[in-house]
Design a protein with these regions (language model features):
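Alpha/beta-hydrolase fold active-site loops
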Residues: 33-35, 112
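Structural microenvironment flanking redox-active thiols in thiol-disulfide oxidoreductases
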Residues: 48-85, 98-102
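N-proximal helix/coil linker or "cap" segments that precede and/or mark the start of modular domains
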Residues: 1-18, 28-31, 59, 78, ...
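Conserved redox-active cysteine motifs that mediate thiol-disulfide chemistry
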Residues: 31, 38-56
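Thiol/disulfide oxidoreductase modules built on the thioredoxin-like
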Residues: 97-142
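Hydrophobic beta-strand anchors of alpha/beta hydrolase catalytic cores
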Residues: 36-37, 68
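Generic structural signal for well-ordered beta-strand positions
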Residues: 25-26, 124
Length: 146
């Protein structure tokens, strides 16, 4: 099963969803940045701690070209908006929830799950393949756009 969880180097599967201000945000528009694609539920008990870790990474690397594209699977859109209003990165909400085709496309078995996408919009690694997220982000920030 570990083999199927690995990411083959693939182009990003497009996602365009409304953000917490109602604007459509496209994942593929972030080409040129190193992106953490994060599938998240703000109503989960580990959410607050996870957000603190992400904020530290974002603050440390955003100026170098790191972005977070966080997809919420909370069932209540208002709750999602209140939970994300102070977050500096891109937070989008999938109104299809657990029935979303995006979850199928990215083979999401559980949430939270994240991926690292390089500056060329190529999926590079899935969370289970990453031991040191900080070092992983540094590595991909050091790679150029082709």
């Amino acid at each position: 099963a570990a083999e199927t969880a690995k990411v083959q180097e693939l182009g990003v599967i497009p996602i365009t969803l409304p953000d917490n201000h109602g604007q459509q945000q496209s994942l593929t528009s972030l080409k040129g940045k190193v992106v953490m694609l994060d599938f998240h539920v703000f109503g989960s008990k580990e959410s607050a701690q996870r957000i603190m870790v992400l904020r530290q990474l974002y603050d440390k690397y955003h100026a170098q070209g790191f972005e977070i594209y966080q997809v919420s699977y909370d069932t209540n859109e208002h709750f999602f908006k209140t939970q994300t209003e102070s977050l500096p990165w891109i937070c989008v909400w999938d109104p299809e929830g657990g029935d979303s085709q995006t979850l199928v496309s990215y083979n999401i078995q559980s949430i939270p799950t994240y991926f690292i996408i390089d500056r060329n919009n190529q999926l590079q690694k899935r969370d289970v393949q990453i031991q040191d997220l900080d070092a992983e982000i540094q590595h991909w920030l050091g790679q150029g756009v082709q």
